[in-house]
Amino acid sequence: MPDQKSGCQARGILFGFKLLSINISPKKFLVTGGAGFIGSHLSEALVSAGHDLVILDDFNDYYDPAVKENNLASLRGEVEIVRGDISDDAVVVDTFTRHRFDGVFHLAARAGVRPSIANPRLYFNTNMDGTLNLLEACRHHGVKFFVFASSSSVYGVNTKVPFSETDLIARTISPYAATKLAGEQMCSNYAHLFGLRCMCLRFFTVYGPRQRPDLAISKFTSALLAGRTIDRYGDGSTARDYTYVDDIVRGILAAADYTEKSSFEIFNLGGAATTTLNELIGMVEKAVGHSAEIRQLPDQPGDVPRTYADVTKAERLLGYHPQTAIREGITKYVDWQRSSQVV
């Protein structure tokens, strides 16, 4: 399907994706969660760089599976898609038996703080057992590196800002955050005990085209475009460090390259700025072109008051520099949602 391939190559040039030294010759990679929001963007970047790719995704019903199917539209015929759950060890073992992977990008997870409070067992099964299955498979099949998508939620109610990788993490406040912190610890163990080179990346509120429909920017944009009321939890003073998806993908690729220099690292990948919920709503209003009717609801359990990434380490070691400011990114996202008619 040459048209799809050329489309991937065009996106790679447009976004400026670069794979540094692992781009010297084509490699084979596994991307778990590759049909999701971040995973599909990463998969396009890897294919555009000429790599062989297998995507492992269970296409679960956390949101409409048709969204994930559409995320992969440009990759049909370019990648192998394995439909399966990472918590099913038989699926993982079969995938690794049939392929010889140079590296694994592990983005598959049950996502979201609030749903994890309602169903912690599901989150532990997928995010912990699933991660362990993958690490074991890497160990036994000679995989060179493992990039793990962690989360800023591991910082919990840390009052020191910006958050640094060297900060003491006293306690997490949601099952989701606990599973991500456990994943980091498992990666550390496998790097130390078995020589698997692991990079753990703490993502800070990623947004952009294809983002999940349950995320705030998606919900606000959909509501405004459809003339519906916006639900705002709390007084709007909570603040987040929003990171555009293209910047996250660049950071992931740079971290994969860094496995040639270090066996284990933790990196913050964020926008290095904070935006309050009220400011965010105002930006979406401006991008859409009209004001919102807001319904205030109580604060939600498990939500932290503020996130803010210190990206000094990623800048120094990875050459990571977020390029898309929040106002520009919101405009891009609203334009995409309008053109996609996802309201």
PLM ranges: what are they?
Residues 161-162, 213-221:
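A glycine/serine/threonine-rich, flexible loop-to-helix segment
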Residues 182, 186, 190, 220, ...:
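Hydrophobic alpha-helix immediately C-terminal to the catalytic Tyr-X-X-X-Lys motif of short-chain
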Residues 21, 45-48, 84, 224-343:
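C-terminal substrate-binding subdomain of Rossmann-fold SDR/epimerase-dehydratase oxidoreductases
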Residues 10-206, 256, 320:
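N-terminal Rossmann-like NAD(P)+-binding domain of SDR-like oxidoreductases, especially those catalyzing
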Residues 91, 122, 129, 168, ...:
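Residue-level recognition of oxygen-bearing side chains
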